[in-house]
Design a protein with these regions (language model features):
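Small, basic N-terminal interaction modules of short regulatory proteins
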Residues: 1-74
Length: 74
């Protein structure tokens, strides 16, 4: 899993797998879900993140988190 936040775009991208994206659906304004060919969720994109994050959580700069598969399985 990989999580990236771009402060200039105020967008967060959560990549759940490395599968190729076949199609995307905007399920709500600013929330886009990406699916593979078998309709499994591959990624989530969230726009206007600062408007959606409630206190006490804040996002002040660029963020990137990588979680290798073996760490998830532990």
């Amino acid at each position: 899993m990989r999580i990236r936040y771009d402060p200039q775009a105020d967008a967060m991208y959560i990549r759940l797998s490395e599968a190729e994206i076949e199609h995307s659906d905007e399920v709500e304004a600013g929330i886009i879900l990406d699916y593979d060919i078998e309709d499994r969720l591959v990624a989530i994109e969230i726009l206007d993140v600062r408007k959606r994050v409630a206190p006490p959580f804040t996002i002040k700069g660029e963020l990137e988190i990588d979680m290798p598969a073996q760490a998830r399985d532990a």
